[in-house]
Curated annotation (Swiss-Prot):
GO cellular component terms attached to this protein's record: chloride channel complex; plasma membrane
Keyword Ion transport assigned: yes
Subunit and interaction comment: Forms oligomers.
Keywords: Cell membrane, Chloride, Chloride channel, Ion channel, Ion transport, Membrane, Transmembrane, Transmembrane helix, Transport
Lineage: Eukaryota, Metazoa, Ecdysozoa, Nematoda, Chromadorea
Protein name listed in UniProt: Bestrophin homolog 26
Native species: Caenorhabditis elegans
Translocase is among the record's keywords: no
InterPro entries: Bestrophin, Bestrophin-like
Length: 411
């Protein structure tokens, strides 16, 4: 589930927000890169020990130093790290945003179902079963798709028989799904077809096609969002692209193990701690590798990371809210009565003065600007504004006449 943190940054206090965000445990940057950072620093110090203690005895230190200096001179030009990461992360975030927009919530469909199949006023609600069945079919269609793209949902609904145990489908409906179930094609569209068949039966019996226009549109939007999620899963970013980026970042820092060493053993500053610990290189590793980890996490938002979508919650939410709406549990308000707010619509806040200042009405930028009293009159003929206007008109006449003469000469 995506880690919430907006509650920790309610104001623009930069220092407070920094510590609040950095001390978050779940979804933390350092948690994501800690193991690889330890591996990088371990290799760095291992090469340092070999270079300073082993190579001087074997006499190969000078040759190794020349190789490292040659790598250092070509490293920044050979691996364009910022360009690769920037373009790749923007592409991944764009696909993540499209997947987020394609998560379907059922409230609009449920309201449209109530409009299409309204409850009877005499107390006997004959349309209640139809409304509940349509909501059930829509939720089942969502489950059938999510179990194909999310391991969490797949683990929850391993087989179609579990839908029967959860009372989402009866045995006859499960048998129909089993007949169509295939390893290569979708079956999520079938419950949507069942829901549409119920609407078609109502139209044929009562000839009420216009009354179901809103419901048709909502079910179509529901199916469109499911199709977009399916397409994002079927057609990912070409595999060679993330391979190139992930390999480039790790190769870059593998080279940094050698090129960021302090190679001069006879430097007078070599005994300070800054010589032995790569401070700036560590910062660069945290930022660049953390940037890449963002892309790795967002690459599949239907996975099992801490920042991935909680699709099981969406399924449960849609089933509960959808059935409540069509069953009338969310309120069947039909009686109209006068209310005091119709005569007194002033805002209602706490009596705390500090809270009142925070919630003050935002006026327009020039709302309370007042000008000194002045009089207005038409401009005289000698006014600069009038002269400027007339001069512009004269220039336009001259330009038009010259253009006309030029055209006549060509003819």
């Amino acid at each position: 589930m995506t880690v919430p943190y907006y509650r920790d940054v309610p104001t623009g206090n930069a220092l407070r927000n920094f510590f609040k965000i950095m001390l978050k445990r779940k979804g933390n940057l350092f948690t994501a890169i800690f193991k690889e950072l330890c591996l990088f620093l371990g290799l760095y110090f291992l090469f340092m020990v070999i270079y300073r203690l082993v190579l001087p005895k074997s006499g190969g230190q000078r040759e190794i130093r020349k190789i490292v200096e040659n790598l250092l001179s070509h490293q920044e030009f050979t691996i364009p790290l910022e360009f690769l990461l920037g373009f790749f992360v923007s592409s991944v975030v764009d696909r993540w945003r499209k997947s987020l927009d394609s998560l379907a919530y059922i409230e609009s469909c449920a309201h449209a179902v109530v409009i299409g199949f309204p409850p009877n006023s005499n107390g006997s609600d004959k349309n209640l079963l139809i409304r509940r069945t349509i909501i059930r079919y829509l939720v089942v269609s969502q489950i059938l798709l999510y179990r194909e793209i999310s391991l969490k949902v797949r683990r929850r609904f391993k087989k179609l028989t579990i839908l029967g145990k959860a009372k989402l489908l009866n045995q006859n409906e499960i048998d129909k799904l089993n007949k169509l179930e295939c390893k290569h094609y979708d079956i999520y569209f079938l419950p949507i077809s069942w829901a549409l068949s119920l609407i078609e039966d109502k139209i044929d019996k009562e000839n009420l096609a216009n009354e179901f226009t809103i419901l048709w549109g909502q079910i179509k939007e529901w199916q469109t969002k499911l199709s977009l999620l399916r397409n994002c899963d079927y057609i990912p970013i070409p595999l060679a692209y993330p391979q190139a980026v992930f390999l480039a970042v790790r190769c870059y820092f593998a080279v940094c193990v050698f090129t960021r060493q302090h190679l001069d053993r006879y430097d007078s500053k070599m005994h300070t701690w800054i010589t032995f610990f790569p401070v700036l290189t560590t910062f660069q590793y945290i930022f660049m590798m953390g940037w890449m980890k963002v892309a790795e996490i967002l690459l599949n938002p239907m996975g099992e990371d801490e920042d991935d979508f909680e699709l099981n919650f969406i399924i449960d939410n849609n089933l509960k809210n959808g059935l409540d709406i069509v069953s009338g549990l969310c309120g069947n308000h039909r009686k109209l009565a006068e209310h005091e707010i119709e005569n007194d619509c002033r805002p209602y806040y706490q009596t705390n003065e500090q809270d009142r200042k925070k919630n003050r009405a935002p006026p327009e930028s020039l709302k309370n600007v007042e000008f000194k009293s002045f009089t207005m009159e038409k401009a005289s003929k000698d006014s600069p504004m009038v002269v400027k206007s007339e001069s512009v008109c004269c220039l336009r006449r001259r330009f038009n006449s010259s253009a006309k003469k030029h055209h006549d000469s060509k003819v």
